[in-house]
UniProtKB/Swiss-Prot annotation:
Source organism superkingdom: Bacteria
Organism of provenance: Clostridium botulinum (strain Langeland / NCTC 10281 / Type F)
Catalytic activity as recorded in UniProt: 7-carboxy-7-deazaguanine + NH4(+) + ATP = 7-cyano-7-deazaguanine + ADP + phosphate + H2O + H(+)
First-level EC class: ligase
Pathway in which the depicted protein is active: Purine metabolism; 7-cyano-7-deazaguanine biosynthesis
Assigned protein family: Belongs to the QueC family.
Name of this chain's protein: 7-cyano-7-deazaguanine synthase
TM stretches of this protein: none
Record EC number: 6.3.4.20
Biological processes annotated in GO: queuosine biosynthetic process
SUPFAM superfamilies, sorted: Adenine nucleotide alpha hydrolases-like
Length: 219
């Protein structure tokens, strides 16, 4: 298994950017892969491109627009408003069915062609917002499936799986990239960079985590 190279599933948001710089500390060669699935917050792809260009990281954007046709949701459809809070039952309407399944599967195909075994993704079960494809059991299951499907030894690594947003901010701080993550990323479902709209679930979670992180710094 090649332990010197890694591919990061990279959206241009807080979590994946933190994982990208975490990977740069651990591996000699890091490649970032993003997806265009006709997301409303497509400005995140511009953030991803800008970050990779600025910090000299090889970057690829794969076309997955088909996902928008298959799975109507508030992240890809202009006529669906993003839920401001998670529903009591079921998944939020911002959940894109099959997104992480497809992202990781396509990245695995890409990785195998490059002779890379390690795939890094920023999913977290601690702050998973009700998304079933961010759970550890799903990632472990998919890892086994991909290995069997392609007769290849992949290792899917999830640095944020068991930490919350405050701890993710602390990781960025410890890596020396806090300002990059704070100012140059886009997490907002409404496509507003840095602090975002302040109203969507992603912005609320990001802000709550940052305030908790600030308290940690003061102690």
């Amino acid at each position: 298994m090649n332990k010197e190279k890694a591919i990061v599933v990279f959206s241009g948001g807080q979590d994946s950017t933190t994982c990208l710089f975490w990977a740069k500390k651990k591996y000699k060669e890091v490649i970032a892969v993003s997806f265009d699935y006709n997301q409303k917050h497509k400005l995140e792809l511009d953030c991803a491109k800008d970050i990779c260009k600025k910090y000299n990281i090889e970057h690829h954007i794969l076309d997955l627009n088909l996902l928008n046709q298959l799975a109507p949701n508030s992240l890809t459809r202009q006529d669906i408003t993003v839920d401001k809070s998670a529903p009591k039952e079921g998944v939020p309407n911002s959940f894109v069915d099959g997104r992480n399944l497809l992202f990781l599967s396509f990245v695995a195909v890409f990785a195998k062609q490059k002779g890379i075994n390690t795939i890094i993704t920023g999913v977290s079960q601690s702050d998973f917002s009700g998304y079933p494809d961010c759970r550890d059991v799903f990632i472990k299951s998919l890892n086994v499936t991909l290995n069997l499907a392609m007769d290849y030894e992949f290792e899917i690594i999830t640095p944020l799986m068991w930490i919350n947003k405050a701890e993710t901010w602390k990781m960025a701080y410890d890596l020396g990239v806090l300002d990059i993550v704070k100012e140059e990323t886009l997490t907002c479902y409404n496509g507003i960079k840095a602090d975002g709209c302040g109203e969507c679930p992603a912005c609320k979670l990001r802000k709550k985590g940052y305030l908790e992180f600030e308290k940690y710094l003061m102690n």
